[in-house]
């Protein structure tokens, strides 16, 4: 032992000096996780040999195991040694990987083991109890040092951030000027926060004036007159991102050729316009048939620094609607800002949508300040109304009173030359002026939604049969958006209900999982039907025939590797026509099981029995059903029909699809509905005008698998059969609803 001390006596003073200077051996070997304790701690718990033992062990990295030939063990206290036993020369070796892993695992569970636990560990690992004790002491010291270093770094960064913010405030105060007279601001007459807000408001007004002129220049229109009431302020080093409250939005996600500050300021101006459009009354909005009408002259006076004059080539549509929906404000904002959820929520209006670029994700934990570039295609459930395709910014902001606002605004030509390739509004036929909604929190999980739709669109391709509906705002206006939102919120509330109806109307549905799976399958069926009716580009349909008002549009597509559709060649046939009866009467007739055999070839004259029923809202017409057709010519039937009926003030739907019995049993047991093949058919029923008291516009659409081989060639006979089927169905419906006693033609089998 003396020889060991002699060999290293020159190291001991320097190490002790380091200890007195406040340094720890741990700082020299921070990369090692298994060091022995500091000298002071060791000395207090041993007889003086422990510090020298630790010195020797620290030379080898702190993971050495000290062993002795004596019974006391190396590094132990003098009281643990047998005085009659002849001491033997101690030897060292590193802790094994197994020992280190076991010690680390135990430390995670218990960083302060008692004497009994240390002895148990020593027996299991072949170490001395004092070695185990020293290891835990060192480990705790190391963890404490790392934690303190991390805290110090965080506090230092926070301190620097506060210093920088304080410096910015001082500079702003030094350069502050009155927004009205341009002289020094009288800070003493107002609070600091009020002064800061006034300064920000004045600067934002100036920026909005500037962006209005630039935006008008980009779209080739003369700039609006800039109001002289807000003189320009001195230039600021703050980015427009700061004015929007967008954190961490410095990444160049729009490309080098794109004026990103211009886009951000466009979003700010759109948000201000939306809020005022939603809150102002007369004379900006005047009462009109079926809602409110926008006063164009008052709009031009109210927003002189808006997005430029309206295009004479496009027709202006403006509408506003308010409703209270059964969804909390946080969930509603989340669904509007997630493109997938937004598309599913408004599947009858939005045939496709995508997020092209994200400029900001907003504040962590919510979407306050989120800004993204999106594209979407809006649709009407008729082949006689072309879809509207557009690219727009979507900006979300929470206002000081707690109200959330989500605004859309078209980019028009501002993105020309960049990767997105936006075209002018006139070329696309659709321009989205500031549109969106204000969302206010209400008690009991409800939200008050005020929706504003303000667009310019080319309606030249709209058929005369549907122009009254389109021009009244029933097709793409705020009333339809809000009515759809109300109905879908009730549907989601029904889907999330955990209880299964006990009154017997649930039928074969016995679990909440089966209920949710069936609703999810019906949701996909409705989305597929709506997209197919309008020949949306999402579903890759190709028109083969159809030009007149009641002509049948026949479209085809090949289904390959799509678990939601059967493989092969699928034909879709759709037509729209007018009926001289109210929409409610048409809806009740088509969803009535007792009259289904009068028009449905699938029933084939059999009796239709409802096997399951799920109510989807307050209106008894909103429901999902599972039907079974009992054919009189057979003892049992394998034909099941999934059907969803939905109705609101702007339209109604009866959509159905035959489903396989085995696949449906899986769904009813809570299985995945995405792998159930569906080909939906059905009806879309719209009022023929804004008052809703006249006739109905009915669209009939079928999807039929004509060949199970995707590579097969489409035969003219298949097209003729589908044409005959839809023509026969139309004639039968007309005869049944209008009371025509004429004999309807037989439908093809």
Swiss-Prot record:
Its main location: nucleus. GO terms for molecular function: DNA binding; DNA-binding transcription factor activity, RNA polymerase II-specific; lipid binding. PROSITE patterns: HOMEOBOX_1, HOMEOBOX_2, START. It comes from the Eukaryota. Residues 86-97 have a biased composition (Basic residues). One of its GO terms (cellular component) is nucleus. Residues 256-494 form the START domain. Residues 26-98 are annotated as: Disordered. Residues 137-218 form a coiled coil. Residues 46-57 have a biased composition (Basic and acidic residues). Residues 88-147 bind DNA. It is found in: Nucleus. It holds the Pfam family START. Keywords: Coiled coil, DNA-binding, Homeobox, Nucleus, Transcription, Transcription regulation. Gene3D superfamilies: 3.30.530.20, Homeodomain-like. Residues 68-79 have a biased composition (Gly residues). Belongs to the HD-ZIP homeobox family. Class IV subfamily. Probable transcription factor. This is Homeobox-leucine zipper protein ROC7.
